[in-house]
Amino acid sequence: CDSDRSSDLCSSDLGFLRNNNEFSSSLAFDYDVYESFGNFLSWHNDLQFYYNQLYEPRSFTGFSMWTRSRATTKNHNFISIDSWIKPVPGYDFFEPRNEGWKQKTYEYADYGFRFSPDYRNPFLVDVSGQFGYGKKYGRRNYHLELGPRIRFNDHFNMQHEIEFNYAENELGYVTDNDKEGDELKITFGKRDRRNITNTLNTSYIFTNKIALDLRVRHYWMQVEYNDFYTLQKDGTLEPSGYDENEDFSTNIFNLDMTYSWRFAPGSEMTFVWKNAIYKESDESVSDYFRNFERTMSSPYNNSFSLKILYYLDYEQVFKNQKSS
């Protein structure tokens, strides 16, 4: 079976599937220039249209278009701009978390850029940003990402990715009353969501056979609700008297260290250490460093693994046995 085109999930599916029961059609146009001109080595342009539906029943969910223009300069700098525009309302059949319900989604536009310097430089900073706007409910989205990279020498390099995201007046599912005998009531909320992600990647190559890699990541999300609504059968929202505190803060910290040693052709030993912390609270802390300190004092899990892969050349073994 095919989950993309089915209302049911398949036990034989592999990979990551956000939603099943989807049916999408797309139309794409490309315009590419591969020969250098002016200050540019190459120039690529994309225009794509998407028409989305449920597979069963065949219901309209959304129409959108995406554009991107990217170029590489003669200095080997990379520049890209893009936009994603949803010009007409649609419906989300998954966010209500209950079969037979839908949420009406509204017009929205998102614009972004990216700049990457020449990666041959020992020090550089990747920069990207996005701004999204939706008139209904005053929805806004701001995104900024910085990625400094340092190559100290041929053995040691370091990369730090800092990602900021602020979603203002975002709509989403909060709760529902699933008690028997009561009419189903689904509550949505208008919220402000803040995300900060810090990721540090380092790599040290001792020899052509021995290497050490370290990845440290901290993810922090804060959600504060401003208003609550009751979802209607037609997908619209009506003001609700719901007044529970649904604000929360989530912290996820991960550390992954990998030591690898290729001790023979086709043979390798790998030692891995993983450290993980997960902390969720309804208490909001606005100071990043104070929040990080609390996270590091939370309970954590450590795991260690050792893997040895040995390549045995049976042809050579049998050849030696015959000769003896």
Listing of model-derived features with the role each one plays in the protein:
Residues 1-9:
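Single conserved hydrophobic/aromatic residue that forms the stacking wall/gate
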Residues 8-324:
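Exposed, low-structure sequence patches enriched in small/polar residues
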